């Protein structure tokens, strides 16, 4: 998502981004020996900017060189089909793509279309009752399973803020999914 990108991402070429990612994959991130197991990219709300296209193409190229799967950020559940198709056009097989935040998309038909195209989708706002509530998520997942897509639906709690961690007085807590 462009608004959260570091300034460097706007300046680097696609080739520079590819080389930077390969360096981290082969030698570790931030001076450590910890190597990534997934490549992340994303898009803005209802839009894919030129910089985001450059990053998605770089992520796709790195995937084709390494086999590391690609996980995406679909801002408020938008642009999932476009992200997936851009990755496929640049060499990523649909089964190696995990489209994130798809449960925020209110139109179940868009989620089903992503699944029909072979993409994996991430229901990761579980416990975060923003625009959708968990009962709606469960209902949609039941439909996806009945349609034969159960193996392509992933559950997660996108709980990256203190507001969601019980140790800081937040809710629902990191163990929420395990308890429901």
Predicted feature locations:
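Active-site beta-loop-alpha junctions enriched in small/polar residues
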Residues: 1, 44, 75-77, 102-105, ...
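Active-site gating/metal-coordination segments in enzymes
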Residues: 1-64, 120, 125-130
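Acidic (Asp/Glu)-rich catalytic clusters
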Residues: 24-34, 61-64, 88-91, 111-118, ...
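Structural preference for beta-strand elements that scaffold enzyme active sites
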Residues: 36-38, 67-71, 96-98, 118-122, ...
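Distinct, well-ordered alpha-helical segments
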Residues: 50-53, 78-91, 108-116
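Charged helix-capping and loop-helix junction motifs
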Residues: 53-58, 134-142, 170, 174-176
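Active-site glycine- and acidic-residue-rich loops that bind
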Residues: 99-105, 124-142
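Short acidic/histidine-rich active-site segments
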Residues: 124-125, 149-170
């Amino acid at each position: 998502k462009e608004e959260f990108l570091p300034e460097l991402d706007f300046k680097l070429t696609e080739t520079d981004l590819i080389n930077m990612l390969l360096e981290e994959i082969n030698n570790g991130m931030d001076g450590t020996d910890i190597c990534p197991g997934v490549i992340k990219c994303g898009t803005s709300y209802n839009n894919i900017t030129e910089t985001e296209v450059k990053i998605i193409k770089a992520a796709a190229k790195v995937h084709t060189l390494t086999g590391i799967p690609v996980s995406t950020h679909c801002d408020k559940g938008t642009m999932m089909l476009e992200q997936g198709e851009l990755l496929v056009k640049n060499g990523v097989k649909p089964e190696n793509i995990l489209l994130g935040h798809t449960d925020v998309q209110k139109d179940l038909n868009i989620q089903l279309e992503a699944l029909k195209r072979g993409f994996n989708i991430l229901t990761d706002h579980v416990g975060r009752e923003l625009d959708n509530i968990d009962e709606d998520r469960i209902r949609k997942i039941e439909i996806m399973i009945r349609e034969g897509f159960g193996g392509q639906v992933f559950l997660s709690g996108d709980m990256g803020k203190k507001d969601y961690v019980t140790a800081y007085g937040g809710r629902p807590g990191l163990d929420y999914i395990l308890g429901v």
